Amino acid sequence: MIKKIDLHTHSTASDGTFTPSEVAHKAHKTGLSAIALTDHDTINGLAEFKRACGEYGIEGISGVEISAKYEKEMHIVGLFIDENDTELAEKLDELKNAREVRNKKVLELVNGQGMEISVDNILSQKDGATLLNTGRAHIAHAMVKKGYVASVDEAFKKYLGKGMSCYVPRKTYSPKESIEMIKNAG
């Protein structure tokens, strides 16, 4: 019998739609025998995810997707990591804290363009949202909702995309640093 697995999923701990428990539930409902949670730059949802996988009788694989940059931005997925690794957690917290600073800077720039987008407008885009787990896409959705742009695509092309007036680069690690973090945690 062929077993179905999914080794790359996201939850509301990063940019996913479902909570870590809901990801496990959906995996169970679709007949997966194993699933990995690989949220962007965080391992915060792994404990809840692993608990839920155990309840549903499926193999829950601890993972992470780390933002890295070498000439261009890339994402490096690590599987079978130790979700209790303090060094990895600290490094990922640095990225998370940098995300909050970046979001505030982007909001300042957007508001400097005459748009009135508040932190609450951003947080209302996602259940369980904080400035630590939201990003430019959530700001773009708020811009659409308030009528400043017609689409998320327009928000990125005019304001939020690389080289545009409201773009702020994000903190990343090098691929070497990212791989070392994953190796040390696995």
Each language-model region and where it sits:
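An N-terminally biased module of ancient metal coordination in phosphate/nucleic-acid-related enzymes
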Residues: 1-73, 158-165, 173-186
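Short amphipathic alpha-helical segments, especially helix-boundary/capping motifs
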Residues: 1-2, 23-27, 80-85, 96, ...
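Domain-core and long-helix interface of multi-subunit machines
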Residues: 6-14, 18, 30, 101-186
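Generic alpha-helix signal with a bias toward terminal, lower-confidence helices
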Residues: 19, 44, 49, 70-72, ...
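Alpha-helical scaffold segments that flank or form the walls of functional sites
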Residues: 22-38, 87, 94-112
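Short alpha-helical interface elements
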Residues: 34, 48, 52, 60, ...
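Active-site gating loops and adjacent loop-to-helix segments of metal-dependent hydrolytic enzymes
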Residues: 67-100, 141-164
